[in-house]
């Protein structure tokens, strides 16, 4: 009987070694395409298990530090302060760009304003421009929706559009991209920002100019791929080098032609 028990637990341990459970956590921007890719990956690799949750880039990187995730999804590069914490903990982290994303500026569909310069966007999100009539629209108060400070999208927008200046104190922070879409779709004076893959007919994307109004470009897959749209960013996976063997197969699949095709179909810009 003892020999049978020993054999059972030996077989169980071998099975567990071949079922590599991977935990992925972080950016809500990267979340949908990671979920879609993981589902197809597990269908073709039944020995692999992948669980994915959002929460924001900062949450994902913190989980990587705490060893409660194997891969951190991020919509911004890892910060110097985060690198120092990882280094102090003896962790060496690898960065992988898995896709690119165009960050769309959105308004309510009934808003007649269809284009804005970067300077106008900066004025709006910093609270210097407070009424749509100041940018050629109707006499209507501007309601600013943003993301929480733990969001990589929040950080990227601040860097690219606000040129690292502070957001206005009265902006409404949303916990996820879906909440931004919902809020803007229900508020006529609203403005917000979301990843290209989240766009729907519930909101209206506007054309953006980074050359003081000489050229305005809409956020589309084509314009993002050609880098004609000015607000494009990389999307990342981060993992501990010590976990490379565990995460390698999934990351290789994401970067493969099949994985990059899923990324493109999901509304993201492939790296290859």
Model-derived segments and their meaning:
Residues 1-8:
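Bacterial N-terminal signal peptides that target proteins for export
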Residues 8-20:
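Hydrophobic h-region of N-terminal signal peptides that target proteins for export
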């Amino acid at each position: 009987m003892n020999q049978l028990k020993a054999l059972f637990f030996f077989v169980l341990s071998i099975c567990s070694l071949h079922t590599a459970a991977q935990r992925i956590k972080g950016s809500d921007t990267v979340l949908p395409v990671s979920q879609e890719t993981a589902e197809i990956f597990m269908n073709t690799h039944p020995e692999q298990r992948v669980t994915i949750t959002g929460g924001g880039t900062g949450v994902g990187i913190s989980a990587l530090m705490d060893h409660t995730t194997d891969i951190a999804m991020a919509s911004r590069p890892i910060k110097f302060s985060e690198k120092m914490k990882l280094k102090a903990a003896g962790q060496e982290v690898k960065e992988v760009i898995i896709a690119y994303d165009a960050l769309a500026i959105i308004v309510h569909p009934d808003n007649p304003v269809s284009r804005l310069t970067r300077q106008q966007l900066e004025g709006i999100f910093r609270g210097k421009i407070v009424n749509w009539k100041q940018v050629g629209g109707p006499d209507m108060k501007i309601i600013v929706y943003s993301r929480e400070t733990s969001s990589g999208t929040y950080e990227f927008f601040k860097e690219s559009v606000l040129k690292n200046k502070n957001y206005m104190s009265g902006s409404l922070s949303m916990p996820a991209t879906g909440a931004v879409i919902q809020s803007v779709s229900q508020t006529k004076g609203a403005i917000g920002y979301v990843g290209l893959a989240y766009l729907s007919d519930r909101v209206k994307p506007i054309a953006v100019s980074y050359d003081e109004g000489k050229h305005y470009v809409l956020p589309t897959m084509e314009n993002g791929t050609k880098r004609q749209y000015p607000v494009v960013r990389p999307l990342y996976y981060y993992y501990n080098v010590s976990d490379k063997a565990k995460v390698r197969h999934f990351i290789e699949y994401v970067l493969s032609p099949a994985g990059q095709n899923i990324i493109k179909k999901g509304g993201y810009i492939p790296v290859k």
